[in-house]
């Protein structure tokens, strides 16, 4: 299987499409006008969902956080505090970057809104050792190289985001690009070739002709 095109890693459904749960993720940046580094946290390998994977801090929207953009921003700030001990982020200053919806073929689905946020001055990220067991700062190219070498487990959306981030030299450049930009939701599809699952993105050959799900 291609290193940059891993299978979904989760159980496929039995044909009935699950409604995705709302979620938020934060791509924390540092480097300012000098460079670009991104924070990743490692999920506890004992966890059933994406155990051992290195991910951007994030998680599902809680019911009390409401609906819509405000709920996604509230969840993003809460997850930053819970998973990386990063406090003091103004939810209104988060910059929308992307929206990814889990393929309809996968049983556990999320509609995840990705935000950019510079690391607050004085913040010292750390993990709780329970849900997340490690963290690190990575350049986009460094993260992709470590994944290709088998040193860093990345899931498909994280890989694709790092591929996009690799086109920017500094955190400031990335933030300037993303501010005010229209975000279009991306919904990959999973197609089977024998026993092997492959993920397709919109516009790729086979995406529009993938078997319909109900």
Give residue ranges: language-model regions.
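N-terminal leader/linker segments that precede catalytic domains of diphosphate-processing enzymes
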Residues: 1-132, 136-214
């Amino acid at each position: 299987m291609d290193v940059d095109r891993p299978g979904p890693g989760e159980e496929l459904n039995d044909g009935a499409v699950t409604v995705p749960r709302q979620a938020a993720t934060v791509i924390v940046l540092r480097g300012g006008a000098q460079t670009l580094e991104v924070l990743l946290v490692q999920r506890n390998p004992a966890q059933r969902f994406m155990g051992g994977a290195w991910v951007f801090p994030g998680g599902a929207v809680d019911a009390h956080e409401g609906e819509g953009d405000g709920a996604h921003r509230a969840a993003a700030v809460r997850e930053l505090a819970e998973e990386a001990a990063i406090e003091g982020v103004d939810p209104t200053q988060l910059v929308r970057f992307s929206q990814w919806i889990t393929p309809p073929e996968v049983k556990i689905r999320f509609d995840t809104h990705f935000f950019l946020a510079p690391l607050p001055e004085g913040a010292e990220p750390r993990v709780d050792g329970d849900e997340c067991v490690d963290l690190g700062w990575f350049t986009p190219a460094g993260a992709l190289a470590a994944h290709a070498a088998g040193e860093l487990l990345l899931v498909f959306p994280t890989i694709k985001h790092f591929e996009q981030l690799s086109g920017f030299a500094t955190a400031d450049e990335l933030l300037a690009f993303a501010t005010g930009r229209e975000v279009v939701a991306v919904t990959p599809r999973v197609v089977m070739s024998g026993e092997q699952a492959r993920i397709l993105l919109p516009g790729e050959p086979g995406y529009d002709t993938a078997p319909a799900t109900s």
